[in-house]
Design a protein with these regions (language model features):
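N-terminal secretory signal peptides
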Residues: 1-9, 19-23
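Flexible, surface-exposed loop/linker segments and immediately adjacent secondary-structure boundaries
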Residues: 13, 17-24, 28-57, 64, ...
Length: 209
């Protein structure tokens, strides 16, 4: 019974030989993400994920009630928590520049330089070298600018966020329109998770520098 319990709840941590690199190079110019953490039930394009499976631009990554997956690509690193669905997009140069968070919780750290976006059904987050956490549910978004600067756009409303160590807000919606925003405490993510993500791409968080 104990062995079954351990098997059911085991967590697989992988030390990638390419930690901090751009990612696995596949034939042509397509890049694939390196998976660095995998536990519980996780799916890539509706197939059960394995540690050696690539994550490519256009892929849909989904976690079940007990699933978690972390991966890094092109200097950026991501942690999907349980009950999360994320589509990985790209720009014309083959680099990941767009993430569509359909639902759930996503913690991300980004290399400085080129612009990226996280898109939800209600809002768009504009990013340049920062860390952020999102929890998306049908009528609200919990958003934490962990450090760095980001832009939250909802329709014609644009909100700038800057932080050195966590600036969190809850944004409420009604029929796609923003109805309110309130300051929140740090929820569902922590500094150690940020440290692990940054370490997977050879960096440390801004608050540890």
């Amino acid at each position: 019974m104990q062995a079954d319990h351990h098997c059911h709840h085991r967590r697989l941590f992988l030390q990638s030989a390419l930690a901090g690199s751009a990612g696995l190079l596949l034939p042509g110019t397509v890049r694939a993400a390196n998976i660095t953490e995998l536990s519980g039930r996780v799916y890539i394009n509706k197939r059960v994920a394995r540690a050696d499976m690539p994550i490519l631009p256009g892929d849909l990554v989904t976690t079940s009630h007990n699933g978690r997956i972390a991966f890094h690509l092109d200097g950026d690193a991501f942690l999907l928590k349980p009950r999360t669905s994320l589509e990985v997009g790209e720009s014309g140069d083959g680099l990941v520049s767009l993430l569509q968070l359909l639902t759930g919780k996503l913690l991300s750290v980004f290399e400085s330089g080129r612009p990226r976006r996280i898109v939800t059904a209600q809002a768009t987050i504009g990013i340049r070298g920062t860390a952020c956490f999102l929890n998306v549910v049908p009528d609200s978004i919990y958003y934490c600018n962990c450090y760095g600067s980001t832009t939250l756009t909802v329709g014609d409303h644009v909100e700038e966020f800057t932080a050195t160590r966590h600036n969190a807000h809850q944004v409420e919606f009604d029929e796609g329109k923003m109805m309110g925003m309130q300051v929140m405490q740090v929820l569902d993510h922590d500094d150690d998770e940020l440290r692990r993500l940054e370490a997977s791409v050879g960096r440390v968080p801004a608050f540890d520098r």
